[in-house]
Amino acid sequence: MASAVPAQVQSSQASAPQLQRGIVKMVLSGCAIIVRGQPRGGPPPERQINLSNIRAGALARRAIQGQPDTKDTPDEPWAFQAREFMRKKVIGKEVCFTVENKTPQGREYGMVYLGKDTSGENIAESLVAEGLAMVRREGIRGNNPEQVRLCDLEDQAKSSKKGLWSEGGGSHTIRDLKYTIENPRNFVDSLHQKPVNAIIEHVRDGCMVRALLLPDYYLVTVMLSGIKSPTFKREADGSETPEPFAAEAKFFTESRLLQRDVQIILESCPNQVILGTILHPNGNITELLLKEGFARCVDWSMAVYTQGAEKLRAAERSAKERKVRIWKDYVAPTANLDQKDRQFVAKVMQVVNADAIVVKLNSGEYKTIHLSSIRPPRLEGEEKNKDKDKRFRPLYDIPYMFEAREFLRKKLIGKKVNVTVDYIRAATNAMEMGVPAFPERTCATVTIGGINIAEALVSKGLATVIRYRQDDDQRSSHYDELLAAEARAIKNGKGLHSKKEVPIHRVADISGETQKAKQFFPFLQRAGRSEAVVEYVFSGSRLKLYMPKETCLITFLLAGIECPRGSRNMPGGMQVAEPYSEEAMLFTKELVLQREVEVEVESMDIAGNFIDWLHIDGVNLSVALVENALSKVHFTAERSSYYKTLVSAEESARQRKEKLWANYEEKPNEEVAQVTEAKERGRNTDPSTSLEITDGLHFYAQDVETGTKLENLMESMRGEIAAQPPVEGSFAPRRGEFCIAKFADGEWYRARVEKVESPAKVHVFYIDYGNREVLSSTRLAALPPAFSTRTLPPQATEYAFAYIQVPQDEDARADAVDSVVRDIHNTQCLLNVEYSGMVCPQVTLQFADTKEDVGLGLVKEGMVMVDIRKEKYLQKMVTEYLNAQESAKSARLNIWR
């Protein structure tokens, strides 16, 4: 503390005290100050000056930590008032002083004057006159006018009973200092982020101070919210080593705040560290430190900063651009996007989980946009390993994922949003940093109506904010708002941060589950128009729906239309997509994907798919597809109330000659009439063997003529398997894959995997016999290439009875199935294809010996009803079936009882 001030303020060697100048850095007590010089390329030197001939009371002192024999000492009477009197007069101001005496220990005594010369106020005299200091009379010399004046001023103060000389001893002037706070978090919360008057008593470094809170005299250490400046590292020997610019940052804060009157907003208290913002009439020290390159923004405390985090980011950005101090080596990331690609307006077409959306640009291009700097809900810890055998569905099985997706879906689907690209996350390989491979991601801030969607999601506790390395600039342009939103969500216990039991969504996926679909079908059919959400679009007419009321997922086929089919992986190889199948699927996606719709369930096919009409905002999707020349009317629509509308829409599309009708040429009416009259019912009966009858009265049959080929193939295949048995458990079944399966009789048969519930439960379909079974994967093996479906196609073909309707009543349907099983199971019959169905060919079946029609027999026995066809060439058969139905009705047989 005895280091010299700069040369211009050095004392001369003359006998008379030389007048020196400096700036008051700190007031130690009522009779001691620290002065400093002007900075020259760094913090300036400083020295302590004690006022000559007077003594003020000693301030309170805390016991030395680690020394149990020391204890706290309180203020002496009027000591704090003397310190405050002098602090308010001289702190931060220029003073001139003389050094009259210097002790062997290096303590300097002298006179201090406010201003640039001795004409200014004598600080010692002012203190004595106010009764805040006593004169040391033992050293007074009568021939010294300044000392005599001090004595006169003291006498006047005594007679006026000022300060130390007042009655009562001054006990009321002793502060009740509080060095510790029992519960800092409660203390901070009790202030409700209101400004508190304070005096900065000590500066630890650029962003940490010790403050005296008024009027209750709490001494607290406060770290500035949102920033971190270079610090002093404590070494093993107790010394401190400053980081680059640590001393400069400390001086910057000291010169502006030390012993100044300020207001402090105490904002948070994580881990017993009090975070706050210091308000001074001349500016915000937090922003100034950033702007001058003495500090950097820190995310962990930025969230609690109450004065606008964007100001801090802007100040830091300014320092980076100017490359000042800690940013002298800063290299800005290169921008690789044009302005038009950085900001654009797009329409939201799909929400992907809870952190990404698919948008349609003005150019018609589709683009996936990930919300910047947020992470969707995910499974943590033991939940990841729970129920490994269960099919994992992230949307329903991850807590709050469904709520997050629904929030985005309801807010965004079909609406235009503003997209500001923040950064592009490069693609990662699976080997990098032990993380899964990800493609390149465009990360952006998405707003609608001025609302930041990511921030809204985080504020509801439906997503969390990603934490970055401090030097990682690839983050949201509104990162601080995201952190603040997360802090609010945590404080209010929202969503993921709630202590309540997590919501569970028990959603039954009955798509492809025939038995389950049968259970739901009566309820959906009776419900009439039901609300649904389109979860997925497989093709123009095939969708997956979520039924909120029934909490189930169903596969849905549009009724009344014939839509082009997309490419499919078939047993004989990849089936090429039909023309305009992609356009039809895109049309359906744009119109209904993830929208709320209404459906009317009419029927169900053998595979458990529901055949229905779908409406969205008053638009019938079947009609819309036909109207846009992306589908044709199917004959099954004839029985529907929408038939006329569909025919009209198709005629309109034909006239426009668009898409499916581009090559359509209208033929003369006469020719059409002749063709209609000429068409007759086909009579090509083929001998076949019925193998398996389903609950929906469909059946699987083998062509008798190819039976020998199948027998030869099976014999050869089993011989090869016997010679080279498959390794048990080596086959990993996948849905849709062909394999061989060991049936209950111990023999191997060709099969197709329909569903994998777990290794112990694999659903297979025997492609040559039409039956199904659930068995362990240990009873499955890869299908030898020599016996694939290319060598011999699947021999079991699915058919349905023509001209009949299966009863909806389960008991009646079971009776009909039993009757058919008794009559035709494993029996050779003659099969004739009458017309095409939605799922499979519709046929009549005759007994090979008697030529009796099996379906007609069911009608005669009152087991089934007649399906009335409108085609003219079928009317003879329809009439025969209707006559049989009338006979059954008259006799009140079975369903007509």
Swiss-Prot record:
GO terms, biological process: mRNA catabolic process; regulatory ncRNA-mediated gene silencing
This protein's GO CC annotations: cytoplasm; cytosol; nucleus; RNAi effector complex
Pfam (any one): TUDOR
Limits of the TNase-like domain: 18-167, 194-329, 342-499, 528-663
Molecular functions per Gene Ontology: nuclease activity; RNA binding
InterPro entries: Silence_cplx_Nase-comp_TudorSN, SNase_OB-fold_sf, Staphylococal_nuclease_OB-fold, Thermonucl_AS, Tudor, Tudor_TDRD11
Main location: cytoplasm
Family annotation (PROSITE patterns): TNASE_2, TNASE_3, TUDOR
Name of the gene: snd1
Name of the protein in question: Staphylococcal nuclease domain-containing protein 1
Keywords in alphabetical order: Cytoplasm, Repeat
Entry's localization field: Cytoplasm
Domain Tudor: 732-790
